[in-house]
Amino acid sequence: MFKKAIKKALNFVRPLASGYLYYDHKLINSLSTTILLNEDGDLLTTKKVASLFAMQDELRDVFKPILTEIQNTSERKKTKILKKYGIENTTLITVLNILIDIAENPGKVKIISHKYLDLAIIQIENKENTFKSQMPKFYQSKEIGESVCIVGFAFPEYKAFKEQANYELIATNEIMNFPIFPISAMITRNIYDDQNHITMFEMSDGIELGMQGAPIVNTKGEIIGLVVGNKNIGPRKLSYGIDSKTIIEFLKENNIKYEEVKNEK
């Protein structure tokens, strides 16, 4: 049912690869999902995913001077400094985020967050070297009982990061294979947000870790929403997403280019 829709989604679904380095040198790979919106390289995802870039900057600003301070000290002084700042083996020291297949050199990023929904736009600094692709089309119509497909990235089985001296992470590009993971579901209910507006909807199946920010597409491959996360109702795991009507309003407010299918069905 969704074979053609998934092929379409391959044109605009992009992974965000993240490396998490802890004080005990444990390195964890993570994946998130974004949607390429236009030829400027603007991306749509959740606010939580976009916040990883702020986390990267904050950790660097906090720990770089501390690591420099303990670099050439005795073990006794090092222990005192670590205790002073509350640093343990499980303390997260460094995060490195890499946008995949967006531009030759994306540069710095700017984040535009929705006022209260888990929705954000990522804008790259260098827009002239973006990789060209077929852009998505948003469709505002949806129905309870409609079959949909969530097309994102999960199960981060890759090796993209390497630790250098003093807890620096670099991208190795050693293994950069990011297969998509589609999940089919059915729209079950509309959801009111905290402002008492219907901006979201519920789906009959849950998503896997890493799929937050993935597009929810209909059988034609048109985006009818963006998946935000899961919720548990008894023993059952359901997912929910923000609808295209709300997304389009957000894009218009911020003068972001996008394509839309008019409701002619």
Specify the residue positions occupied by each region the protein language model found.
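Conserved catalytic-core segment of clan PA serine endopeptidases
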Residues: 3-8, 26, 59-130, 137-139
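Catalytic histidine site
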Residues: 12-80, 231
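Beta-rich catalytic cores
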Residues: 30-31, 118, 212
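Catalytic nucleophile loop of clan PA
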Residues: 35-36, 206-227
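Conserved hydrophobic positions within beta-strands
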Residues: 36, 108-111, 187, 216
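C-terminal subregion of chymotrypsin/trypsin-like serine protease catalytic domains
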Residues: 43, 51, 217-265
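Flexible, gly/ser-rich surface segments that form the specificity/activation loops bordering the active-site cleft
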Residues: 133-199, 207-209, 227-239
